[in-house]
Amino acid sequence: MNLSSLKPAEGAVKSRKRIGRGPGSGLGGTSTRGHKGAKSRSGYSKKIGFEGGQMPIQRRLPKFGFKNINRVEYKPINLSVLQTLSEANSLSKISVEDLIAAGLVSRNSLVKILANGTVTTALTVEAHAFSKTAEEAIVRAGGSVVKL
């Protein structure tokens, strides 16, 4: 057996419907489109969202919400990540540049430190925002917090 001798299983491949090729083919005449009406014509396509004259769902449902232009998006970083980063690179001070170098955040993202995990070493952590519990945990471990 080799690749050039492989064939699909018997009955696995069907020949396609050749429509509109005369009455002898069995698929001539209306060519599977039925008689008359917009759907039988060439170039037919119904509008996206058209429901046959019924009020479409996008008009039945009310508008709601808005996008707040003053929203500030923070990239969350957990204490467990800071701990592993400090152990791997033997750091006592962790800045946003260190997080960028480690590939954890992009250059123009704002960083918020969250309290998932524990910190055992005294770390000086620089970030744009801290959760209360994360700030308390860093200070309890003998470290300090610098808000940018």
UniProtKB/Swiss-Prot annotation:
InterPro entries noted in UniProt: Ribosomal_uL15, Ribosomal_uL15/eL18, Ribosomal_uL15/eL18_sf, Ribosomal_uL15_bac-type, Ribosomal_uL15_CS
Record's keyword annotation contains Ribonucleoprotein: yes
Keyword RNA-binding on entry: yes
GO molecular function per UniProt: rRNA binding; structural constituent of ribosome
Pfam families documented for this protein: Ribosomal_L27A
Compositionally biased intervals (Gly residues): 21-31
GO biological process, one term: translation
Gene3D superfamilies, alphabetized: 3.100.10.10
PROSITE patterns per UniProt: RIBOSOMAL_L15 (PS00475)
GO cellular component: cytosolic large ribosomal subunit
UniProt keyword annotations, A-Z: Ribonucleoprotein, Ribosomal protein, RNA-binding, rRNA-binding
Region ranges (Disordered): 1-51
Family: Belongs to the universal ribosomal protein uL15 family.
Function recorded in the entry: Binds to the 23S rRNA.
Subunit structure comment from the entry: Part of the 50S ribosomal subunit.
Protein's name in the database: Large ribosomal subunit protein uL15
Annotated organism of origin: Porphyromonas gingivalis (strain ATCC 33277 / DSM 20709 / CIP 103683 / JCM 12257 / NCTC 11834 / 2561)
Lineage, highest ranks first: Bacteria, Pseudomonadati, Bacteroidota, Bacteroidia, Bacteroidales
